[in-house]
UniProtKB/Swiss-Prot annotation:
Designated name of the protein: Saoe class I histocompatibility antigen, A alpha chain
Ranges facing Cytoplasmic side: 333-365
PANTHER family: HLA CLASS I HISTOCOMPATIBILITY ANTIGEN, ALPHA CHAIN G, MHC CLASS I-RELATED
GO biological process: antigen processing and presentation of endogenous peptide antigen via MHC class I via ER pathway, TAP-independent; antigen processing and presentation of endogenous peptide antigen via MHC class Ib; immune response; positive regulation of T cell mediated cytotoxicity
Chain ranges of the Ig-like C1-type domain: 209-297
Record field: transmembrane: 309-332
Renumbered residue ranges of the record's region Alpha-3: 207-298
Family membership: Belongs to the MHC class I family.
Functional description taken from the UniProt entry: Involved in the presentation of foreign antigens to the immune system.
Disulphide connectivity of cysteines: 125-188, 227-283
Glycosites: 110
């Protein structure tokens, strides 16, 4: 269940704050809420999305024809009408709170009402392998910049500027940290356990990565080795390169884990090496779905079984055979023409005019 927003205080965060990476064997629940003002075009647009681990399970959009909190995962269909009515009520209430907050922040930052502004809020909890609270989150942003956040002790706030300090003082006076801590330690943990049980076939599965290494020449003496991990779940994975057993993390290019669009994830890590030294490098992949870590090397393409000189000789022989066949055909044609009383040049001109045998015309030259 989502946490209730304070009615007169600032509530923020969603897409600009990225999902915080969790520990191996742990699980997380996050809500991301965003409100964007649009002067002259009506009320701000408010969107809320909820994630369990890497799976979106609920969504609310104030621009929908009939704004409601809606399921985004099959296992959420188990929740009854009361659940959706309550979550919809909270979504609408938060949308109104954010509308007020946008006006309040204009005053804090001495901004005009002409421009569009964004407030964002992310909150949630991590569970450790033992099922207990590992960490709680409550982070806020304004116009894409950090604004105020609950500290790891869940008892105090960190404000990033003078405007955020105004909010901090209000929240401290209202004991907002205590209210948030009670949610994170209680309700958040309880509902995360429930979702993990209801969606265990999806959320607690482990699909190992499909791995391979590709080779990309950069110059005459350098090449890029890229280690791929595809089709894995959950998203937590480690992909590293080693040279003669020594870690190359500082020298490698690493992309963030990306969704593949089918419920699984992708990742790759690359390193530039000297040509001829490729076999000194190994890629190491660790993932929950693997019985043990993988070690990969680039495998050069297999050499042809027939030597190059042999291929050249075969092609030369074929060339002689083809040439002989063409000459024989020409001689046969010439003899046939002579028997009919016509010359070779006359036959060639006649065939050319009919547009049939081009090869004979070419042989004439």
């Amino acid at each position: 269940m989502t946490v209730m927003a304070p009615r007169t205080l600032l509530l923020l965060l969603s897409g600009a704050l990225v999902l915080t990476e969790t520990w191996a064997g742990s699980h997380s629940m996050r809500y991301f809420e965003t409100s964007v003002s649009r002067p002259g075009r009506g009320e701000p647009r408010y969107i809320s999305v909820g994630y369990v681990d890497d799976t979106q399970f609920v969504r609310f959009d104030s621009d929908a024809a009939s704004p409601r909190m809606e399921p985004r995962a099959p296992w959420m269909e188990q929740e009854g009408p009361e659940y959706w009515e309550e979550e919809t009520r909270k979504g609408k209430a938060d949308a109104q709170t954010f509308r007020v907050d946008l006006q309040t922040l204009l005053g804090y930052y001495n901004q005009s009402e002409a421009g569009s502004h964004t407030i964002q809020w992310m909150y949630g909890c991590d569970l450790g392998p033992d099922g207990r609270l590992l960490r709680g989150y409550d982070q806020h942003a304004y116009d894409g910049k950090d604004y105020i956040a609950l500290n790891e002790d869940l008892r105090s706030w960190t404000a990033t500027d003078v405007a955020a300090q105004i909010t901090q003082r209000k929240w401290e006076a209202a004991n907002e940290a205590e209210r948030t801590r009670a949610y994170l330690e209680g309700t958040c943990v309880e509902w995360l356990h429930r979702y993990l049980e209801n969606g265990k076939e999806t959320l607690q599965r482990a699909e190992p990565p499909k791995t391979h290494v590709t080779h990309h020449p950069v110059s005459d003496h350098e090449a890029t080795l890229r280690c791929w991990a595809l089709g894995f779940y959950p998203a937590e994975i480690t992909v590293t390169w080693q040279r003669d057993g020594e870690d190359q993390t500082q020298d490698m290019e690493l992309v963030e884990t990306r969704p593949a669009g089918d419920g699984t994830f992708q990742k790759w890590a690359a390193v530039v090496v000297l040509s001829g030294e490729e076999q000194r490098y190994t890629c190491h992949v660790q993932h929950e779905g693997l019985p043990e870590p993988l070690t990969l090397r680039w495998e050069p393409p297999s050499q042809p079984t027939i030597p190059i000189m042999g291929i050249v000789a075969i092609l030369a022989i074929l060339g002689v055979v083809v040439t002989g066949a063409v000459v024989a055909a020409v001689m046969w044609r010439k003899k046939s023409s002579d028997k009919k009383g016509g010359s070779y040049s006359q036959a060639a001109r006649s065939d050319s005019a009919q547009g049939s045998d081009v090869s004979l015309t070419a042989c004439k030259v």
